[in-house]
Amino acid sequence: MYQPSLEEVKSLAGQGNLVPVYRSINADLETPVSAYLKVARGPYSFLLESVSGGERLGRYSFIGTDPYHVVKTGPGQPGGQVDPLTLVQDEMDKYRLIPVDGLPRFHGGAVGYLAYDTISYFEPRVPFMPADPQGVPESVFTFVDTLVIFDHIRHDIKVVSHVHLDGDIDKAYAEATRKIDDLVKRLGQPLDLPPELQGPATVSTPVEATSNFTKDEYNKIVEKCIEYIYAGDVIQVVNSQRFSRKTEAHPFQVYRSLRSINPSPYMYYLDLDGFQIVGAAIETVVQVQDGIAATHPIAGTRPRGKTPAEDDALEAELKNSEKQRAEHIMLVDLGRNDIGRVSVTG
C-alpha cells in the first residue's frame, strides 16, 4: 500500500535523513478543486494547479496544508526585515533528501511568494521601500512535508509524506503513514461546501476598481520612465499600480472564476493566514533542476485563426512585428544576463 515499504526505507537510511513515502489512489472522481476544498485545514494551505484548457495541459497539480514551519519577513514580521531566501535556505539545509521512483521532482518543500519590495535584498542599489500600507509581509513561505499530487497523465493521486530518519525510524514511518491515511480519509468524504462557495463562481460587483494613482500621476510616471530610456539609464521599466475592488465573493470563488475564464498551465491559490493570493501564468519564469537554470519567457500573442491560412498569416504578422521582435531580443538579453550572474559556463 505504501511505497517504499518500512524495510526499504530502513535500507536507505545511510543515504540521507529524509525520504518520501506515498500511497496512490484513483483520481477519476476527484478534481484538484474538490480535493483542495476537502483537505485544506487551518490558516495556511495552497493549490498549485495545471488546468486543462485550450491546447495545454500540465501534468501535475499540488495541494498542501498544515505546514510544519512558516517564514514571514518584512517590517513588523516574525522573520524581520532580512533576505527571505536565506531563511528558506537555512531550513532546507537541514535535510538530505533521498529520492524515490514514482514521484515528480516536487513532493514537498517551501511554497510561497516574494513581494517586489524584496528586490532591495538582491540589488543593494535599490532603496528599501516603506512598509506596505496593506500590512502584507514582504514574503511568506510555508514548508510542507505532506501533500496531495494529481497526475493528469496517469489519472491518479499520490498522497505523500516524509519519513525523518534521524531518530526512531519505525515511529517516523508510522507518523508519515498516519498523515497519508488522514488525507486519504478526507479525500474519501463527500464534499460539504460552505454557503459562500455554493452556486456559480461569479465575482461581479457594481463597484469599479480604483487605483492608488490618479491618471495624471500615472502619466507623469510614464513620462519620467521615457526620459530614463532616452537617457540610456534603463532598457526596461515596468510601471505598476495597485487596483482595489470591493467584493463579497469568497477568495476561492475568485480563483474558480479565473480558472474558468483563463485556464493556464500554472495556476495558484495561496491561503496565507488572513489574506489570499490568486493568479495564473502561462510561462516558466525560472526553473532550476539538476544544477541547470532555465527561463522560458513568452512575449507577443495573437488569436488563433479560423483556418490554417489565417494561422499562417497571424504567425507571419508576429514574426514581422518590429515591436514583438524587439521585445523578444530584450527578454533573451535580460534572461541571459540574470542567469549569467548566478551561473557558470560549461
Give residue ranges: language-model regions.
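Extended alpha-helical targeting/anchoring segments
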Residues: 1-346
